[in-house]
Amino acid sequence: MLVQDNLTDKQSDYAIFLPAISSFYATYIGAERYPDKVKSIIGDRLPKGIPNMEAMNWLNKQEALFPYKWSLYSAGHANMDLTVHVPKEDMVRGRSADTLMVADSGGFQIAKGVWPGAWADTKDKAAQKKREAVIKWQSGIANYGMTLDIPTWTYLDPKASEACGIKSYQDAVDATLFNNEFFMEARGKDLKILNVLQGSNHTEADSWYDTMKKFCSDKYDKPFDGWGMGGQNMCDLHLILRRLVTLIHEGLLEKGQHDWMHFLGTSKLEWALLLTDIQRSVR
């Protein structure tokens, strides 16, 4: 008989890994909870000793074989319409209140041309509809949401650039600025926001930071609540350490105010060790 291994209890002062929930995986949970509404393809394929899919749902601390209270879910994978019941979204929407969900915004979908619209045009209706949907969805399902940032490399892909209307580095910056201002006003009262930093090299990363840092400052009555490290900021150790020093000296990594720093797209084991060491040093 398999014995529960509580991974939440084993987490102490390590950098927290966020398992990214895929819509396919979540569908299996929903199919088991609502068999009359969702077709399951699991059948008899569960390994011996695993009674059901709920045993594989780490957000269910009662039934999971390996409870783990932290997760990441992306707007790019989700059904964001919270006005309707969607069984395959129940793993996320129906999670226990003692879990923690970080919601990615879908900026990657914009950068790949999957969410078309004239994102450089602040009056574009398609972009505004998606903008509103993302912040409402984040406010409804997450503890932390990320800003709807547009990566600076977006314009380098001609097809994606044409689909999303981002033609230059400055277009990406200006569109993200507008998105940030909108999120600042439209977010739900309980949603915390991570200010995502982008940039394909040190020069772009520094410029982006200087432009966006105000959203985490006391310039606003309710500033953003932490940082998302994207682009070069998530993979360049020199830049990461330099940025941390700058944040500390500028009062933008304050306990109780900027308590979360997320590194986008980072899951290699060596980075788990490195980020744990950095986290302990900062603390």
Model-derived segments and spans:
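A general structural detector for well-ordered alpha-helical segments in enzyme core domains, enriched
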Residues: K129-V134, S168-F183, W208-M212, I240-I248, ...
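Non-catalytic, usually N-terminal nucleic-acid engagement modules in DNA/RNA processing proteins
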Residues: M1-N180
